[in-house]
A protein has these predicted regions:
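Gly/Ala-rich beta-loop-alpha elbow adjacent to hydrolase catalytic centers
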Residues: 99-103, 107
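Active-site nucleophile loop of the alpha/beta-hydrolase fold
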Residues: 121-131
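Conserved alpha/beta-hydrolase
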Residues: 48-66
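Catalytic histidine neighborhood in serine/cysteine hydrolases
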Residues: 213, 217-234
Length: 258
């Protein structure tokens, strides 16, 4: 588990969630950057309804106050995910992992670290390095003393839904996601044999859908794809959420029984 300690109270609805299932299978569900477990709660509850043991952790620095996130890095998030995975694997025969956005990045990381994972579900994952000019721009902002920029949360087509995410994006943690997390993973993608369900919103204003196109070509295991016409980045809370819940559980059932 991460050694990071958040100082602010957890926001209502941002709590982690754990469920004891009736089967021998487990599902680890992971939320995204500046978000919290609420964005993946529907996915988690769908797995629970299907009998799965479920772990839905709250990543360090998330779901409290953005000030808590400033000191967090990729290593803190992977430590929390690893702890949740181990809790599941101790009580389950097979485990699937599902993640949104950075949660998708952490899902890829888990599959690479644990090749015994039965399958993974990635929804609009951050999966590719940033362009050098973007990295240079953000590093320049940090050098000038800028720690945050306007938030990237709540990219949702449904006008009746708002993601419970931070209004700002912390730059140092963002750079850690890209440089410590995603960039070193890309050369490893081809080595994995873990089956993947890759869900991609055609209209994503946070993560370019091309990232998923590239991931599908790079990943060594079998890849099934679902393209969404109606939902934006936070698809797990958008118009296509029920279709995602159903597809994720159906995919998990298939790979676990194979």
């Amino acid at each position: 588990m991460s050694d990071h300690v958040d100082q602010s109270p957890v926001l209502p609805g941002a709590e982690p969630w754990s469920h004891a299932g009736t089967s021998a299978h487990g599902a680890l569900c992971i939320h995204g950057f500046t978000g919290n477990p609420s964005s993946m709660r529907g996915v988690a509850e769908a797995f629970a309804a299907a009998g799965y043991h479920v772990e839905l952790p709250r990543l360090p620095g998330h779901g409290t106050a953005v000030s808590d996130m400033l000191g967090t890095r990729w290593e803190h998030w992977t430590a929390e995910v690893e702890a949740a995975y181990l809790r599941l694997s101790q009580r389950c025969d097979r485990v699937v992992v599902a993640g949104l956005s950075m949660g998708g990045s952490l899902t890829l990381w888990t599959a690479l670290e644990h090749p015994e994972v039965a399958g993974i579900v990635c929804v609009n994952p951050v999966a590719q390095p940033q362009a050098p000019e973007v990295v240079e721009m953000v590093e320049g902002m940090i050098a000038e003393g800028v720690e945050m920029m306007p938030g990237i949360g709540s990219d949702i087509a449904d006008p009746d839904v708002v993601e419970n995410s931070y209004p700002e994006t912390p730059l140092r943690p963002l750079m850690s996601l890209v440089q410590d997390g995603v960039t070193p993973m890309v050369p490893r993608y081809g080595s994995s044999k873990v089956p993947m369900l890759l869900v991609t919103s055609k209209n994503d204003h946070v993560v370019d859908p091309i990232q998923s196109d590239q991931l599908a070509e790079q990943w060594g295991g079998p890849v099934e794809r679902i393209l969404l016409d109606r939902s934006y980045h936070v698809a797990t809370q958008d118009f296509d959420k029920e279709a995602i819940f159903e597809a994720a559980v159906a995919f998990a059932n298939r790979v676990i029984s194979s």
